[in-house]
Amino acid sequence: MTRNGGPPGRIEHGFPHLDVVRASITALFRRLSADGIRVYDTSFAPADAAFGPDEDLHLGAHRVASAMVRALRLPDARVVVAFRPMEEAATVELASGPEYFVEVSDRFRTHRADLAAALAHEVAHVLLHRLDLRFPATADNEILTDTTAAYLGTGWLLLDAYREDALTHQKFGYLTPEEFGYVLARRGRLLGEDLSAWFTSPRAYEAYVRGRARADRDHRRAPLAAAGTAERLRYARARRAGTTPGRGSAYRFEEHGAGRLVSFPCPVCGQRLRLPVRGPVRARCGLCRTVLECDT
């Protein structure tokens, strides 16, 4: 895992990986099921990530790693943590298990507060390895790993480790701060969780708010009934013309023997739904079982 995914001194912002992030959430639902996702309803506790003032470094690292393993529901996995000089924050050896070796940078000997963030990413790698869930491209796999950590309750630590000011530039993981906020907000909406009070980094909280605003927009896209006026007007024009909307539109019209259909992604899991174009309708997503109010 890298400490800073961008050029030295520069941290990337915005939502450049959003398509892969959304695909990652869909992949998690398909692999774990809606009930399997809801098992991860409790985020990693701040107390489990903290080091006591007199706590031994190695014992504390193994305590945090063990708590991370429990949080990600890996009951038979064991994570062994070792420190060494390295440029990356951490790396994991993905063997057949049940024992996995994680190497972390020596800088965590003094910056212990961020050790749990580094372990969150690496233990998420272990979970995905166990699930046999991966994307073809290495870069996309790293996005999948960060998304998995955030969506299943441990990755908020990666965002909280983000620092950016005149003297400090620090970011763990491969998602931008805003993308971490986006994933955490989608998790929060699903499970009724609000992490606002957990962030110790003001910049992390600001990124979380920006990500949450972007996640909220997913629930206001046509043909969802909650779409705003401008969005509804654009949808109505495209529906009358029978044309595929421009780039950036989530919905697509399809001709079918029984009439026209509109397809669009579920705002919760990303699975595409196909509904008849006929006005107000209530639909249940077959993957996450969310009931959606729509106006097609």
Could you describe each region identified by the protein language model?
Residues T2-A27, T91-T110:
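Charged, low-complexity intrinsically disordered tails and linkers
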Residues T2-D19, A23, K171-T296:
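Pan-zinc metallopeptidase signature
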Residues P16-F44:
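N-terminal, Lys/Arg- and Ser/Thr-rich interaction peptides
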Residues S33-G97, R107-R112:
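Auxiliary, metal-adjacent structural segments of Zn-dependent hydrolase domains
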Residues D41-G52, L127-L128, P245-Y251:
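A short, surface-exposed helix-loop junction/capping segment
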Residues Y100-L119, P136-D140:
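Short pre-active-site segment immediately N-terminal to the catalytic Zn-binding motif
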Residues A116-L133:
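Active-site recognition of the HExxH zinc-binding catalytic motif
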Residues T138-G173:
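Post-HExxH zinc-binding segment in Zn-dependent metallohydrolases
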